[in-house]
Design a protein with these regions (language model features):
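Glycine-rich anion-binding loops of enzyme active sites
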Residues: 1-87, 212
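Solvent-exposed alpha-helices and their adjacent loops that cap or buttress functional pockets
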Residues: 18, 32-38, 57-61, 86, ...
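General beta-strand structural signal in soluble alpha/beta enzymes
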Residues: 24-28, 67-70, 127-131, 153-155, ...
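Active-site glycine-rich loop that binds ribose-phosphate moieties when present
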Residues: 44-56, 99-117
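Active-site-proximal betaalpha loop/short-helix elements
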Residues: 103-180
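A short beta-alpha structural unit
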Residues: 181-187
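Helix N-cap motif at beta-to-alpha junctions
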Residues: 188-193
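Acidic, Ser/Thr/Pro-rich beta/coil linker or hinge segments at domain junctions
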Residues: 201-250
Length: 250
């Protein structure tokens, strides 16, 4: 049920998050509507940026390194822990593990603001892209297509927490195609990779180089993303729907 205290809690969270980023909350409207059994929040953020400082998802260059922060299936971990606790308990999960997984929304968190700021200050960044629905696999296709390049990705270097891997194994989803809000793909000059990874590490953010930009796109064909696994190359797996959506509709 909608209560005054619930409204106050939601708007206090919005105000706190905006305050941390120096963002002003302008306007707002709230109402109680039949047919909804939970709060629904919609927002839009507007801002200005120096045109010389804009970093797009379309800026990858041949020879660039591609980094990934935090890891695969961050938001998926929290969603499954919150929505399927009994299923996970049946797989031997403790209440402590469930609470930790559910808290992935805040730790490691689904914001990439700090990741982007640190990376931009530490090295020469050409492209940024945040994986969401469809996971990191889909995001790789998106950033390659936007930039008009081909990518080589090393499956063995893709970061994923032990808790996320365990959860995905237990419910039968592929973390590569599961919603990964909180992760950030960073395209950078190869020589600045270590500097960026180390700068992120000082703030407690895990990052790893997961691949390289192989070449510019050849006219007449789409961008290619290939995956190296066990010293052999294979096509990147494709996910027509997010693994979370598949899980909940089966």
């Amino acid at each position: 049920l909608a209560t005054e205290s619930l409204f106050e809690e939601i708007f206090a969270q919005i105000a706190d998050a905006c305050s941390q980023l120096g963002v002003s909350v302008a306007g707002g409207h709230s109402e109680v509507t039949t047919g909804l059994d939970r709060p629904l929040v919609i927002g839009q953020m507007l801002g200005e940026v120096n045109s010389n400082e804009v970093i797009r998802s379309s800026g990858l260059l041949p020879g660039d390194a591609l980094l990934l922060t935090k890891g695969l299936a961050i938001e998926a971990t929290s969603i499954v822990a919150r929505e399927m606790p009994d299923t996970l308990r049946g797989k031997g999960w403790s209440d402590r593990d469930l609470a930790e997984a559910a808290n992935y929304l805040t730790q490691p968190g689904i914001s990439v603001v700090e990741d982007a700021r640190i990376a931009q200050a530490a090295g020469e960044i050409h492209a940024l892209h945040d994986p969401t629905e469809g996971g990191v696999a889909t995001a790789l296709v998106e950033i390659a297509t936007a930039s008009g390049v081909d990518l080589d990705i090393d499956a063995d270097t893709l970061p994923i927490s032990l808790l996320s891997q365990r959860l995905c194994d237990d419910v039968g989803i592929d973390p590569f195609g599961a919603i990964s809000s909180g992760a950030l793909l960073i395209g950078c000059t190869a020589g600045t990779t270590r500097t960026i990874v180390d700068a992120l590490a000082t703030r407690g953010i895990v990052a790893a180089q997961i691949g390289t930009v192989r070449s510019g796109r050849v006219e007449g064909r789409s961008s290619e993303v290939r995956l190296r696994r066990d010293n052999s190359w294979e096509a990147l797996p494709q996910f027509s729907v997010d693994e979370i959506a598949r899980l909940f509709t089966e």
